[in-house]
Amino acid sequence: MGSEMEPLLRAWSYFRRRKFQLCADLCTQMLEKSPYDQEPAPDLPVSQAAWILKARALTEMVYIDEIDVDQEGIAEMILDENAIAQVPRPGTSLKLPGTNQTGGPTQAVRPITQAGRPITGFLRPSTQSGRPGTMEQAIRTPRTAYTARPITSSSGRFVRLGTASMLTSPDGPFINLSRLNLTKYSQKPKLAKALFEYILHHENDVKMALDLASLSTEYSQYKDWWWKVQIGKCYYRLGMYREAEKQFKSALKQQEMVDTFLYLAKVYIILDQPVTALNLFKQGLDKFPGEVTLLCGIARIYEEMNNSSSAAEYYKEVLKQDNTHVEAIACIGSNHFYSDQPEVALRFYRRLLQMGVYNCQLFNNLGLCCFYAQQYDMTLTSFERALSLAENEEEAADVWYNLGHIAVGIGDTNLAHQCFRLALVHNNHHAEAYNNLAVLEMRKGHVEQARALLQTASSLAPHMYEPHFNFATVSDKIGDLQRSYVAAQKSEVAFPEHVDTQHLIKQLKQHFAML
């Protein structure tokens, strides 16, 4: 079949079937017949088509969807020169954790991240970290659940300049960018678009891509919305958010597209204007009713603003439009679990299992839901599956930690002790396991060991209130009132509504007043 097809048609077929390497190799063979493959021959349309197709194939091999995947690196967080209001009005900022005024589960029930927001049901880039207050916190914050190392710069996920291009052919790069006459290419719209994407995504030369986009926009007399979106993307990568905002707004006036709404919302989110982003998404929904990506964007913002009830409503709207949306199902399931409805959560996680999601996290959640819904026959088998599917040490540590909770629930403290120790063997930065192990040691009467474990837990996770409160309680019992008071204050900072902490502080103040 292959020998009967024309080479260009076969290359196009490979491209459509996402066999990009085969497509690029075939285009290379076709271009080798002409003396130079640096630029397409003007009188040979086949050569020109092969050149464009090869550029597109090489771009697709390293292409990243920039709408969803967005990670702020340490460099972007700490060295950010954009001035943002330090004391924003409540409910208008993503940088400060909002208070839970929506009737959702409190911090005592639902664990929170370092940024002060509840842990989401679906791991997304940047949901783990938020914006750290200090460099030390930034370095300590894991980039995702899979690695403890923070991303140092957002450019780290883009291919290094020249690296990918050198790999594509042994003779050197496919296109020698320094020799390109951008003005000539900007006058050929079809060529210019393929070349722009190659320069931006494959070569990661944002400045040259911006130059080409500016010349092409000028040539189109500022009437082509596509080029305005691309200029906005370049400005966003360069950290020029206000300029990016202008370009995206101008593109939306000419042609309303879902992607443009999403790019503009990203700009508002990084400028810490979630309310503006919400209004923009709602404008988008007026133009594109029921669009899943816009509904999901609204739900994510509400979730980050600690408004779990509104987030759940929008995730339900997402499921009405697309009933196989994994993120929406996982987030609604998580919300039901922490709202003391494990049976309902179990239905959502089983739905994920039916859809073909088969990983450690899902079986871990199924095991917990089965236990709290009193379906004990399925609990341990789910955790066994989770352990067998764990891809790294952190995942195994989380499974052992949850098994420790099951052991506490059935009253087997020895098993719980072993499970928490195994969690620490797999991940010795697991603050929750240190805290729970300290409680078990305290019950055995090992006070000093419990205090040491609690100090470790509070230093690893200063945003958690439990280690601080437990340390304050232990110190109070052995008469170390000063340390007890300091720890209780830290607990109050972490969780101001915690009644037991307030009682302890009041009691300690009475002690100090009597001295």
From Swiss-Prot:
Residue ranges the record marks as coiled coil: none
Intervals holding TPR repeats: 4-37, 225-258, 259-291, 292-325, 326-359, 360-393, 397-430, 432-464
CDD domains: TTC8_N
Cell location: Cytoplasm, Cytoskeleton, Microtubule organizing center, Centrosome, Centriole; Cell projection, Cilium membrane; Cytoplasm; Cytoplasm, Cytoskeleton, Microtubule organizing center, Centrosome, Centriolar satellite
Single biological process term from Gene Ontology: establishment of planar polarity
Matching Pfam families: TPR_16 (PF13432), TPR_8 (PF13181)
Tissue-by-tissue expression: Isoform 1 is retina-specific whereas isoform 2 is ubiquitously expressed.
GO CC annotation terms, alphabetical: BBSome; centriolar satellite; centriole; ciliary basal body; ciliary membrane; cilium; cytoplasm; fibrillar center
Keyword Repeat recorded: yes
Keywords of the record: Cell membrane, Cell projection, Cilium, Cilium biogenesis/degradation, Cytoplasm, Cytoskeleton, Membrane, Protein transport, Repeat, TPR repeat, Transport
Region (Disordered): 89-109, 118-137
Alphabetized GO MF terms: RNA polymerase II-specific DNA-binding transcription factor binding
Main function: The BBSome complex is thought to function as a coat complex required for sorting of specific membrane proteins to the primary cilia. The BBSome complex is required for ciliogenesis but is dispensable for centriolar satellite function. This ciliogenic function is mediated in part by the Rab8 GDP/GTP exchange factor, which localizes to the basal body and contacts the BBSome. Rab8(GTP) enters the primary cilium and promotes extension of the ciliary membrane.
Subunit structure: Part of BBSome complex, that contains BBS1, BBS2, BBS4, BBS5, BBS7, BBS8/TTC8, BBS9 and BBIP10. Interacts with PCM1. Interacts with CCDC28B. Interacts with PKD1.
Protein name in the entry: Tetratricopeptide repeat protein 8
Organism: Mus musculus (Mouse)
Gene symbol of the encoding locus: Ttc8
